[in-house]
Amino acid sequence: MLDRRSFLRYGRPPVATSEASLAPYAPSDAAPWDAARARHLLRRTGIGARRDDVDALLAMTPEDAVDRIVRTARNRPPLPEPLWIGERKPRARAPQEERQAWIDKNDGWLAEMYQGTYDRLLGDDVHGRFRRLGEAFRARMTAFWANHFVADLRTHKIAVWLFEYRQTLRAHALGNVRDAVHDIGLTASMLDYLDGNTNRAGAPNENYARELLELFTMGQVGPDGTDNYTQADIAELARALTGWTTSKHGEAAVEFNADRFDSGPKTVLGQTGDYGYDDVVPLLFQERAWEIAHFVGRKLCREFVRDEPDPAFVDVVARRLLDEDFELLPVVLAVLKSAHFFDAAHVGALIRSPVELMLGTHFGFGRDVYDGDLQTLRNKTRRMGQDVFDPPDVRGWELGRAWINTGTIEDRVRYGRELVHHAPPSFIPDTLARPVAADPRALTAALCEEHLAWTLTDDEVDDLANDHLRNGVSDYYWDPASDDAAVRLHSLLIALLSLPAYQLR
């Protein structure tokens, strides 16, 4: 049985052999450009690593592979506007039937948004390998920023607002951090979630100002251990953010009301002026550039490298972010091309989120996510601690080891096993038809490499082959064409998905 304590012991030594720098990865005998590293790149930029994608990457240099995925992601188009984007929410005094009809339609629109989010992470409905891989990475980066600029399902209950919020995150997924901070604060979801609607001259609401400093830009404490701001800064910043409200009819548009704006002088981070919304975001990046770069840089390192990144590497990434004037594209390219990223100590060093685990299993077994799967998928990821549009609070999900506890670990294993039972009908026969299937150990090793982010020892592979394919006897008695071969292979796949290593990426 998989328990939390054994799971948390199951990991690589935390010490990398590469230096904490952005020096590019150069394949060598000690660190070859092989299937394990190609899968590592695919799992960190997408939701999984299929054999044909691995082969395609290995036909390229690692530098070219990163370029194709990341630059394609950057060039992916905006989300197409749904047909319902202009529909207005009925007024509160509208007949009950009209209001209920809108609620029913809105629920359907929200379901469309869930389906679209899963499809994009899987790269579905995108033709061409690198367009598909690029779309999956764009979706991953959108999800990354959704866990940074957090708004919850209470505000997303209006589908138009959710679409605008996700479209804004997607637009800035690999863009400029400063621009992202500016634009996300003027979405209806964020104004509603952090009480911008009630922030007005003479009666400021400090919620958004506080989270803008603490969670969206610099954090409470800088890398040198000193406070980044004071309560007075929060109060003055809140005054500068007054005047903006959401539409009262469920539209995505936000409005500036000069009568609600505090036009007096404010002092923020030691600077004084008649600041408004458009003034204070550049001011924060001017006065706390290093602190913001470090705060965001550490999050990028946690996303791509490991949950507790090397502080020296965080400093290097933060410095590069500063040098690039907070443009993400060159920074992400540098991180993913670095020897530090490809260091063996970082392969399989991150724990999959519930959404990554469930969608990754669908992806690994070639199973699409259909409309009928949506509620089941959402219910299961919620039980494991993640509802894709509904983070627990404004801090978002904690990630890493926080995903694993006594209440979630059995669900994570059980749901993975269930997906094996519902793999496409062709998966088992196609696997048994592969040339490698003639050798039970070789087949076991191949499946371990394909489905696990962490390479097992030779003894572990032997044990799996012996327990499930050989059935405790010699290779002579293994025949992939036999009547019981499918049953044995199914048993092996269940065993693989029950391993702690399957929870990693």
Model-derived features: positions:
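Flexible, low-complexity segments enriched for small/polar residues
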Residues: 15-25, 29-34, 39-50, 289, ...
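Solvent-exposed, amphipathic alpha-helical "stalk/arm" or coiled-coil-like segments used as scaffolds
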Residues: 111-115, 119, 138, 142, ...
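N-terminal accessory alpha/beta regions
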Residues: 37, 41-172
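Active-site substrate-binding loop specific to GH73 endo-beta-N-acetylglucosaminidase modules
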Residues: 2-3, 7-20, 92-103, 113-116, ...
